Swiss-Prot record:
Keywords, sorted A to Z: Ribonucleoprotein, Ribosomal protein, RNA-binding, rRNA-binding
Keyword check for Ribosomal protein: yes
Family: Belongs to the bacterial ribosomal protein bS20 family.
GO BP of this protein: translation
Protein name (record): Small ribosomal subunit protein bS20
Xref: HAMAP family: Ribosomal_bS20 (MF_00500)
Origin: domain of life: Bacteria
GO cellular component terms given for this protein: cytosol; small ribosomal subunit
Role: Binds directly to 16S ribosomal RNA.
Pfam families associated with the record: Ribosomal_S20p (PF01649)
Gene: rpsT
Length: 85
């Protein structure tokens, strides 16, 4: 356990940030999974789910959870999947 005041605060802020980051990553993965399931099941709301997944990817990239290049690469893959179905 840290003894220095600033180190104690960093432990608290790191724990808070960890919870926030885990929640955002979970939202991202859920959005992408729902899109993939809709594509596999030929659902009608594929385009709406694609937009939601792309938005989640952009949000994660802006918060530093994933890199900007990964977000763009994943969005490209989403749009290819949506176009092929």
């Amino acid at each position: 356990m840290p003894q220095i005041k600033s180190a104690i605060k960093r432990v608290k802020t790191n724990a808070t940030a960890n919870k926030r980051n885990a929640a955002e990553l979970s939202k991202l993965r859920t959005a992408v999974r729902k899109f993939n399931e809709a594509v596999e099941n030929d659902a009608k709301d594929v385009l709406d789910l694609e937009v939601k997944a792309a938005r989640a990817l952009d949000k994660a990239a802006s918060k530093g959870l994933i890199s900007k290049n990964k977000a763009n690469r994943d969005k490209s893959r989403l749009s290819k999947k949506a176009a092929n179905k």
